[in-house]
Swiss-Prot record:
Residue pairs linked by disulfide bridges in the UniProt entry: none
GO CC aspect terms: apical cortex; cytoplasm; cytosol; nucleus; plasma membrane; Wnt signalosome
Protein name: Segment polarity protein dishevelled
Species this chain originates from: Drosophila melanogaster
Tagged with keyword Cytoplasm: yes
Domain PDZ, residue spans: 252-324
Location of the DEP domain: 404-478
Record localization: Cytoplasm; Nucleus; Membrane
Length: 623
């Protein structure tokens, strides 16, 4: 809006009203330096308080601003020789009409009429609201006099629900249906409509006459709450996790040969007509570089040395590469696959006595209802008391332990291509004694009892070890337990050809010691991808396969588990300690020598049926 001095005595003022685009022009017969707000209002003839007056001015801190002036004696600011003004309605509504094309007097007259009409409409609207409220109250009073007390209570409840739905108050939400209140009669459903009476419907029609703002406030719908995702049920068991699904850990170990002048490991491997079975760490010597590092353990498979991969190499080639690397000065980098952990923790194991079966929800619910409705029958059917054995009677313990329904897993085991009939693992025997022998409180006491059984010659180790280990295979000694013959467990003819007892004889042990070095069982999961498919008995299981059946010239099938691997490794360790190891070391240039024995390493074969398939050659080198 511009104001220019006209002839030194007249001031032209251009102003805007609310949101109108066309400005208005007035002339004030006063110099611009003396014109006040009162003079401006007199010219406009707007002495009421319906407008606020803003003028363009210059502020020292903010620059050009719109300054509101309310004092009539204030001189209007002059900005760049001009006076700029805006008139804004005080009540927030646009009270200006299309009078921009009319003269000033007609525009002022039209605006005055508009204000009067608005006031009259507001008064009429207020009177209508009061009349409607009075009518509604009278109707409610008449209905309250006619209805019974019970119906009145239902009506009040319906009104509360109605207002709750209209206003969206979360505190007034009805209680959720539970299993006790889920049954609803049809008569109750008919009486729970949104409008229970015609008066409420009339009230809703009356509410449509309100202003748009009031209708928005009344009919505001409550916001829907986001449905919380149901928590995952803990009943989803870990049955999908089996021993064979746990992968091996592949690590890279850099060994510094400057501090120690020898590697300090013995490597073992085997070969047969189906191919080579890989290179494994047989034992670790104290004081060597590997022992000082501490990350490599007996039974680990060597996959790579100094960026040379053993995947497509034979055992002889891999040994040659290892010997060449050891003889060279400098650090050695070994990539090894860790041996199978015989004792995985927590929920990664499933007890063999707990089979995994699909769950039928309907049968489960029916079974639960039957249990809750027949408590007396359940009380009568009590589980028979389990007979506990005397810990001092070792013979009775062995007899009970070898029964078919004893719970101890006794079956054919595979070790070094030899089938050991009716063998069990030491850890399983300790668990069985802990559960079935009286006055055995802890695992240490159970282990002591099983060790006494071994010393008393009731059970035997596969290679005649006299110290008990939970990771070894054991068989029952029939010479000490003649009553067990004919029970369907132990028979001499089930042993490999040439053996007269269930444990290997001393001569057989010496033969194995001279021919077989420390050879751990191949891991369940091959740590590297290859097309290697050996034809001998224990083939590697690929990741994700739940079970593997093994056939090695024997009439029975076997399933390889982590405990079997641990037992085989423990038995092999016992042979390692009996083997002669040779360590030749030199500072900066390590010389390695070893012994290689070919043929006849199978210890007599497995049953004598597939003799050609049982030809195994093993080696043992010390680095």
């Amino acid at each position: 809006m511009d104001a220019d001095r006209g002839g030194g005595q007249e001031t032209k003022v251009i102003y805007h009203i609310d949101d109108e685009t066309t400005p208005y022009l007035v002339k004030i017969p006063i110099p611009s330096a003396q014109v006040t707000l009162r003079d401006f209002k007199l010219v406009l003839n707007k002495q009421n308080n319906n407008y606020k007056y803003f003028f363009k001015s210059m502020d020292a801190d903010f620059g050009v601003v719109k300054e509101e002036i309310a004092d009539d004696s204030t001189i209007l600011p002059c900005f760049n020789g001009r006076v700029v003004s805006w008139l804004v309605s005080a009540d927030g509504t646009n009270q200006s009409d299309n009078c921009s094309e009319l003269p000033t007097s007609e525009c002022e007259l039209g605006m005055g009429l508009t204000n009067r009409k608005l006031q009259q409409q507001q008064q009429q609207h207020q009177q209508q609201q009061q009349q409607q409220q009075q009518q509604h109250q009278q109707q409610q009073q008449q209905q309250q006099q006619q209805v019974q007390p019970v119906q009145l209570a239902q009506q009040q409840q319906q009104q509360v629900l109605h207002h709750q739905k209209m206003m969206g108050n979360p505190l007034l939400q009805p209680p959720p249906l539970t299993y006790q209140s889920a049954s609803v009669l049809s008569s109750d459903l008919d009486s729970t409509s949104l409008f229970g009476t015609e008066s409420e419907l009339t009230l809703d029609r009356d509410m449509t006459d309100y202003s748009s703002v009031q209708r928005l406030q009344v009919r505001k719908k409550p916001q829907r709450r986001k449905k919380r995702a149901p928590s995952m049920s803990r009943t989803s068991s870990y049955s999908s996790i089996t021993d064979s699904t746990m992968s091996l850990n592949i690590i890279t170990v850099s060994i510094n040969m400057e501090a120690v002048n020898f590697l300090g490991i013995s490597i073992v491997g085997q070969s047969n007509r189906g191919g080579d079975g890989g290179i494994y760490v047989g034992s670790i010597m104290k004081g060597g570089a590997v022992a000082l590092d501490g990350r490599i353990e007996p039974g680990d498979m060597i996959l790579q040395v100094n960026d040379v991969n053993f995947e497509n190499m034979t055992n002889d080639e891999a040994v040659r590469v290892l010997r060449e690397v050891v003889q060279k000065p400098g650090p050695i980098k070994l990539v090894v696959a860790k041996c199978w952990d015989p004792n995985p923790k927590g929920y990664f194991t499933i007890p063999r006595t707990e089979p995994v079966r699909p769950i039928d929800p309907g049968a489960w619910v029916a079974h639960t209802q039957a249990l809750t409705s027949h408590d007396s029958i359940i009380a009568d059917i009590a589980e028979p008391i389990k007979e506990r054995l005397d810990q001092n009677n070792l013979e009775e313990i062995v007899k009970a332990m070898t029964k078919p329904d004893s719970g101890l897993e006794i079956r054919d085991r595979m070790w070094l291509k030899i089938t050991i009939p009716n063998a069990f693992i030491g850890a399983d025997a300790v668990n069985w004694v802990l559960e079935n022998v009286e006055d055995v409180q802890d695992r240490r006491e159970a282990r002591r009892i099983v060790s006494a059984m071994l010393r008393s010659n009731y059970i035997k180790h596969t290679v005649n070890k006299l110290t008990f280990s939970e990771q070894c295979y054991y068989v029952v000694n029939e010479e000490r337990n003649p009553n067990l013959l004919g029970r369907g467990h132990l028979h001499p003819h089930q042993l490999p050809h040439g053996h007269g007892g269930h444990a290997l004889s001393h001569a057989d042990t010496e033969s194995i010691t001279s021919d077989i070095g420390p050879l751990p069982n191949p891991p369940i999961y091959m740590p590297y991808s290859a097309t290697y498919n050996p034809s001998h008995g224990y083939q590697p299981i690929q990741y994700g396969i739940a079970e593997r059946h093994i056939s090695s010239g024997s009439s029975s099938s076997d399933v390889l588990t982590s405990k079997d691997i641990s037992a085989s490794q423990s038995d092999i360790t016992s042979v390692i300690h009996q083997a002669n190891q040779l360590t030749i070391a030199a500072h900066g240039s390590n010389k390695s020598s070893g012994s290689s024995n070919r043929g006849g390493g199978g210890g007599g074969g497995g049953g004598g049926n597939n003799t050609n398939d049982q030809d195994v050659s093993v080696f043992n080198y010390v680095l």
